[in-house]
Amino acid sequence: MTTPLTLENIRRAPKALLHDHLDGGLRPSTVLELAEQYGYDDLPAHDADELAEFFRTAAHSGSLVRYLEPFAHTVGVMQNHDALHRVARECVEDLADDNVVYAEIRFAPELHIDGGLSLDAVVEAVLAGFADGEKAAAAAGRTITVRCLVTAMRHAARSREIAALAIRFRDQGVVGFDIAGAEAGYPPSRHLDAFEYMRSNNARFTIHAGEAFGLPSIHEAIAFCGADRLGHGVRIVDDIDMDAEGGPKLGRLAALLRDKRIPFEMCPSSNVQTGAVASIAEHPFDRLARLRFRVTVNTDNRLMSDTTMSLEMLRLVEAFGYGWSDLERFTINAMKSAFISFPERLAIIDEVIKPRYAVLVG
């Protein structure tokens, strides 16, 4: 008998997460405690529920630039080893509680050095927190594998330095590189030296593109920079029209991305909040999924978007009528697209995802 698609049952399903920002997923209570512990005085609220409401309200801004503003508060309390370690550990525990079995968590080390830490020390603290979070999850009966992506801010000039950081820690849990931040005015091609460095070291990277800016951002990310994955990429629908018979007609860029199986790290709730799309029901996720693009489900920022992987999946189920087989396909899409080795990806798909979905399908 097929298990009903309720939130409680979706929570039981194994999940793979590729696009989640460490500084966008703190517990409100942790933000308060770290602020008090380390003397951060700029919080807009001093009650966990009120603070959570502040982040939710700020996220629903309709603008990527305004959506990013509240990160000053989370980054502000993540400026020493212990704070970074705690946030990383709790991140893993929270994901494991939602039955995420594989996650790639990204953050920008350059934003966490105001307290005197070196870039290397920042990464070391986060990786140690991830490792302790995995152990805590295992002790609670939940197995999760967490890896790290280091991100460079696209408005800054440290991307080559951050790419080198990714390579230094590639055997310690860092599996890739990313650029993030406001897209308009900061095209991916400004960071070609960083991407060339990653390619020259046979390393993987993703690029935030096609979220708040259009097709040129996606084109640069793929054609000039050589991205392995796209962060968001929702504006690819601008390259999909209708033919004379009313069927889909893919432009050359959209066709290339589908042909090459470029993964889309789609974050439905976040895209609504930033104004990239009007609603979940109008999100291009379903259109792309039906056209067999490699779409994946992601959270982006769990605190700001007040979301989990289970909630993101439920919202897609409610909007588009998906069944368990669809959720399994999206999960396998994510695992196929992960930046770990092929044997590791295959093991999680064959030994964890497929068997557990088989139970849910009945």
From Swiss-Prot:
Its EC number is 3.5.4.4. The record marks 232 as: Important for catalytic activity. Pfam families: A_deaminase (PF00962). It catalyses: adenosine + H2O + H(+) = inosine + NH4(+); 2'-deoxyadenosine + H2O + H(+) = 2'-deoxyinosine + NH4(+). Substrate binds at residues 21, 23, 181. It is an enzyme of class 3 (hydrolase). Its cofactor is Zn(2+). GO terms for biological process: adenosine catabolic process; hypoxanthine salvage; inosine biosynthetic process; nucleotide metabolic process; purine ribonucleoside monophosphate biosynthetic process. InterPro entries: A_deaminase, A_deaminase_dom, Ado/ade_deaminase, Metal_Hydrolase. Binds 1 zinc ion per subunit. Zn(2+) binds at residues 19, 21, 208, 300. Keywords: Hydrolase, Metal-binding, Nucleotide metabolism, Zinc. GO terms for cellular component: cytosol. It comes from the Bacteria. The keyword Nucleotide-binding does not apply. PANTHER family: ADENOSINE DEAMINASE. Catalyzes the hydrolytic deamination of adenosine and 2-deoxyadenosine. Belongs to the metallo-dependent hydrolases superfamily. Adenosine and AMP deaminases family. Adenosine deaminase subfamily. This is Adenosine deaminase. It comes from Mycolicibacterium gilvum (strain PYR-GCK) (Mycobacterium gilvum (strain PYR-GCK)).
